Amino acid sequence: MIRKILAITTIFFISSCAELQQVVDSLPQQTEGILSNADIGSGLRQALDLGIEKQVSKLTQKDGFLSNELVKIVLPEELKKVDKGLRDIGLSKLADEGIKVLNRAAEDAVSTATPIFVDAVKGITFNDAKTILLGNDNAATTYLQNGKSSALYTKFNPVIKNSFAKVGADEIWTNIITKYNNIPFVKKVNPDLTDYTTNEALKGVYTMIAVEEKEIRTKVGSRTTALLQKVFAMQD
C-alpha cells in the first residue's frame, strides 16, 4: 500500500514539475521585451545621434540650408523692408547675396559645431523615457530642444560669428545696411544678424534631427541597430 502511495506521489510530483517547467519556459517570452528606463533612454539617444549623422550632416554641404525649404534661412521681418528697398533702387543682386551669405554662414557653422550637438545628446537624461518613446514623432527631438537650447546657443553663437567673418557675411551686410540707411526718408536699421542666424540655424538642426526620428519611428527599415529595433518596437 505504501509503495502505491509513494508511486502515486512520485507521478504527481513529476507531473507537477513538468507543468511548472512549462510555465517557467513561457516566462522569458513574456518578459524579454521589457526594457528599463535606461535602455529606452539609450535607444532615444541613439536615434538622435543618427539624426545628427544622417540628416544634420546634410546641412554642412554647400546649399545645405539654402536649397532646403525646411530649413532655409530667410530674412527676419524687420529686414524685409531692407530687401524691398534695395530691390527698388536696382540692387537686387546685393539683396540676393545677403540672403545667401546668411545660409552660407549657417552651413559653415554647423559643420564646425557638429561635436557640440553630439555632446548635447550624450549629456541628455530622460527622466521618463517611456513617455517620450510613446509620444509624438518628434518627441525626443523636442525634449532635446527644450532641455539644451540655452546651452547650445551659448556654445554655437561664437561659431556663427566666426563663420560670418569667414564667408564674408559681415562685410556684405555692412554694405547692405549702409546702402539702405542712405536711402532718403527710411527708418535706419541696425540688426543683430548673428543672433538671428544662430537661432535659425539651431532650428534647422532640430528640424533635421526630427526628420530622422520620424523615419526611425515609422519605418522599421530605418532601425539600423539591434537597440533601435528593440526600443522602437515598443511604440509600433
Feature locations, PLM:
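Sec-dependent signal peptide recognition
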Residues: 2-8
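C-terminal motif of bacterial Sec signal peptides marking the signal peptidase cleavage site
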Residues: 13-16
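Bacterial signal peptide processing site
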Residues: 18-21
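N-terminal Sec/ER secretory leader and immediately downstream segment
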Residues: 23-101
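Alpha-helical transmembrane segments and their juxtamembrane interface "caps"
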Residues: 59, 91, 112, 142-143, ...
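An amphipathic alpha-helical core segment
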Residues: 159-200
